[in-house]
Amino acid sequence: MHFALAGVDANPISLILWGIFVGYVFTSVGAAGGILAGVGHMSLFGLKNANMVKPMNQILTLVSPIVGTPLYLREKRIVVPTAIALGLGGIVGALIGSTLSSSLLKEMKTFQPYFGIVTLGISLRIAYECTAKFRNSQKSVKAANDTFAAKVKELKASGKMNELKEIGVNFKKIGIQNTFTFAGQEFNYNGITVFITGLLVAILSASLGVGGGFLLVPFMTSVMGFPMYIVEGTSVLSILVSSSTSILNYLSMGSALDLQFLAFELGGVAIGTVVAARVSKYINARYMKMFLALVLFYIGLKYVLPLVGIKI
């Protein structure tokens, strides 16, 4: 099937299948959805316009935030003031990143090596998360996760979900310095640090055309010490804000979207998201991350090595 705006011929079934893969990985691992979307657009389907690829990547990564945000809010799994600070920084960063990328990285010959370097970095980060050192550092965080998950299960079984607010995110102090409790544990953070992080992450993610979860999640878990149970919801809300800003800015600068092409991919992403929600609990997350780290490392090399005359 010919997609005139994208300027490529592609089998709709292939688009759907790739979308399923992207949706599954993004939902089950929580990272690399935008990177995989970009690989599909550039290497599998042959899109040649870098400024078309970037917003199309980000649109595919919006499925999970759009679906997940209301659910996370209902379960009190979003640190709203944190998400707002990240989102405000993200708006500024997304405008800067997309504007610079639209002019400086408009050609594939400059965009792909940049994309590859960041992909290599992401692969190394995911590989690190598979090590015993990283898993041991997350034991205290896991305790809060397990406490909250057990309580949610108990409240659901007894029909008392209205009591969830007692153990969910509850703020004691909001401002530059913030304090909140979650699952009986207290957490503190600086709002300015969060804003600056949101800005920097959005500059990078908007310039690449990805969501930014690969940086936000490690920041909140490793630097801020937040439990993963609230990190997921907080990150998807901020990604929703920054990615939407980036997409709109690319469009305002003249980037085009092949909506027919995207429709097939989005259908696949939706299917992959649902499948991951149902079956990912039966698949060893560490093995999945190890596989993804290897795939991303290869992809990164594929885009970087041509700089020194090597093609793989």
Regions found by a protein language model. Name each.
Residues 22-26, 201-206, 242, 246, ...:
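Hydrophobic transmembrane alpha-helices of secondary-active solute transporters
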Residues 25-35, 205-213:
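Short helix-coil transition sites and intra-membrane helix breaks within transmembrane domains
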Residues 37-52, 205, 215-230:
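Interfacial segments of multi-pass membrane proteins
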Residues 49-56, 81-85, 225-236:
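Membrane-interface alpha-helices at helix entry/exit sites of multi-pass transporters
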Residues 62-65, 123, 240-243, 297-300:
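Small-residue-rich packing faces within the transmembrane alpha-helices of Major Facilitator Superfamily
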